Amino acid sequence: MSPVRDFELRRYTGTFKERRYLNRGAAFALAAALDAVRGGGLTREMLSEAGLFVGVGPHLDIGTEFPHITGGEMERSKVDALWILRFLPNTAASVIAKSCGIRGENLTVGTACAAALSAIGEAFRRIRDGYLDCALAGGGDSRAYP
């Protein structure tokens, strides 16, 4: 495992209020998606009917991004209204879809290490079988926190 040094989502998104919903793994997924869209020369118009297939990890290492729980109770002073969004597996896909203008099928796959590959396979099948003409597929996860 190698650390990701100096990762700053703002470099990819600029001012972007949805950033507060993302855990580190979801931020990596969003950055990768934006890189893929820009690198592929795709526009929001081209992606409007595209599908989105995102693989995510199981969030087993919740690091310091989630409220401290002691004796089955959350420390209320550390809980903000949106904390649950950083834990839900489909938050990354939702934010990617909004950022890229994708309004087609949206699927989140949570099969641990194989999640991104499973997402890519699902996108391939949808295109091969004629359900979609275009899809963005991949994943993101993080087991380490800075």
Q: What residues fall within each predicted segment?
A:
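A glycine- and small-residue-enriched flexible loop/hinge segment at structural boundaries
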Residues: 1-42, 85, 89-103
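Acyl-thioester C-C bond-transforming condensing/cleaving domain
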Residues: 38-49, 57-146
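Short, conserved beta-strand segments within well-ordered enzyme catalytic domains
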Residues: 29, 51-55
